[in-house]
Amino acid sequence: MAESVYKVITLVGASPDSWEKAASAAITQATHSLRDLRVAKVTEQDIHIENGQLTYRVKLEISFKYEGGD
């Protein structure tokens, strides 16, 4: 197996419907600017409440193959 390096970033996704949809929103958005996503790990969940409206929020660590540069 070849050696490889992965970078991990933190993202927060939000949804008025569920934590699952919040996580999916973050991952979907990440696919627009990142390549070769590998693993998403939920590190925190909370619910933001404003004027009686709930927003489910998920903090994720997402890893992707590092190709250098920054």
Model-derived segments and spans:
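N-terminal, polar/charged subdomain of small-to-medium soluble alpha/beta proteins
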Residues: 1-70
